[in-house]
Amino acid sequence: MPVFYRKDMMPMSQFSELLREYIKNKDITIKALAEKCGIDRTYLHKILKGERKVPSVDFVENISLQLMLSTEDKSRLMELYNISEMGEDVYNRRKQVSKIIHDMANTNMEEPDALTFKTEVDIDSVPEISIYTDKRELRKNLQVLICSDVHNGSDIQVIAQPTEFLTNLLSIAAEGSESTINHLFFFDNTSGEKNTAKYNLDIFPFICHLAQKHEKYEAFYYYEGASAYFNSTNIMPNIMITNNFLIRTDSDYCEGVIYRSKPMVEFYMRQFEKFKTKCAKLLDHAVDILEYVYFWYDDNANFIGVDFQPCTMLCLTEDIYNAHALLPADAKKFVKAKLTMGKKALSEHKFVNLFSEKGLAEFMTTGEIFELPRNSYTFPTLAERKIMLQIMISLCENGMADYRIIKDDYFAVSKNLCINISDNTSLNIVARNNCFSDFSYLKISETSLVQAFWDYFQHFIDSDAVCSHEETIEILRSYL
């Protein structure tokens, strides 16, 4: 039978009430359950009354097993336990970050299908003012007119909150073009809210998806109270400007006005540029491996990296690097200098690298290095790979780096995504296509996003999802 909860109930009370409901449904006495679990009956009574904290996740696992709970019921009980341990805001934020990572790992980096509709528009045939009160008509004309202008070399200026529709519209319009998209929006900094990162994390995937697809997508943000913004009487808050069109719509793209007017376009462009100067740049793109290496080793802070494979760049000897790097001489020298800086930083800052054992096995079997595009190096030999693995083990044993294996049962690490985060400084995201020939490099420095990801991985490292330092070293040794 379904169980319902009041929003004003404390997390432990919710846990206790749900557990009481499960016990009642299973028709088992408290005494019998306590004996099955090997715990004191009085202690279990106090937990069921919400007078005692649940001692550990093992307790929840054990009692779920003894009650023979379904996967869904156990998951709900575990969720309430985690909420009681972390607090609801922290739990929801970490859950949100986990979902963002999962979605980014499954983003399709391949080229989308070509547009199947006509994008050429006779500008003179478009009315000077077009008013739309039908959502389908408005959205169709937005796509046609913006795509037509971009096809003829126009950039796009946007003031609007990131949404799925806007991301799809701009992705379609920018596909295959060299046009720049300048996008202005706000991040929430509502005073007094416990979890101001929630709204920012809500819109971040839309921004990130577009940035990974289009190198010339430039995102700028300012701070605003989200509740004040959405409760305001601002009419037609969304603004889009191309060479020939000024577009204003409501927040949901259901109604709007499209102006074909050069004076209007020029006036709003001047206002847009003024507003842009008051905004901060959200992200930087790296267009090649050299810029990415600069991003990676430029942060002077503690560092967590998450990838399918272990980080092998810090394990390259000079001989191995010189033998396999397929770069021009000046680029080869630059990357080598940055790698030296990265190794030196290990003596001053903490570096944690999370990876999968499958990734380790694949590197030791093939020599492929997922951190680099395939056209930038040749694969190290088996003997060289063993030297690199020995260096990796040495870094772990000497406390220079903390390599940790993620257990596949808890977290599926993707080949298509690498995340590197510096302690409250920056978030670096690398997305790869399925052929590992095209990489997207992004660096984000907005505080609420960086702190949310840093907190998530700090918690994740200490969870049962990750092998201990000693367990990881033992597994690494098994591949020598």
Residue ranges and their predicted role:
Residues P2-T29, K36:
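A short, Lys/Arg-rich alpha-helix, primarily the initiator
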Residues A32-A34, I63:
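Short alpha-helical "recognition helix" segments of helix-turn-helix
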Residues G38-P55, N62, M78-N82:
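Recognition helix of helix-turn-helix/homeodomain-like DNA-binding domains
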Residues V57-E61, L65-L115:
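Short amphipathic recognition helices of helix-turn-helix/homeodomain-type DNA-binding modules
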Residues I101-Y132, R136:
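The feature captures two recurrent sequence modes
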Residues V126-S478:
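Hydrophobic protein-protein interaction segments
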